[in-house]
Amino acid sequence: MKPYQNLTNCTAAPYASYILNGHPTSEEIEDSRDLIRLSEDQFVHWNALPNKNAVRPIATPCVYEQHRYQVPVDNSTCNVANAYLDLYEATGDKLAFAKAKALIDNLTVVQNITNGQIPTTFDLRDPERNKKRSYWINCSNASITILLRMAELTGEE
């Protein structure tokens, strides 16, 4: 595979968080903003157009994992939401906080109403296919961690 053929948010957003969690200079903060913008421009979907049956095929807002895997993944949502929250904490950027909150709130929208599990992918499925949905432990951990972080930041339980 040639370089840049399969971009992913899984490096840019976490690296922005890494920079912002140190003692970033103003130049490093701007570099982090650029990394977050890259993640948003390439992978964040704030809305989805309905299909021919007037159904939106994915729960939005969400974050796709990579170019070759055009599926919204909870861990990717958490990567970008964490970067937004880190930017908010470093700069007070209220738009970054609002974007993080929108992404994190959607985790509770896709959550299974019976058992509380958050699926690894946010694609809408028919009931039979939905029974075979996967729940990756690393993704579940990321979802729980970001929900707890948001609860702490907002004072909500």
Predicted regions and their residues:
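Glycan-recognition and catalytic cores of secretory/periplasmic carbohydrate-active enzymes
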Residues: 1-157
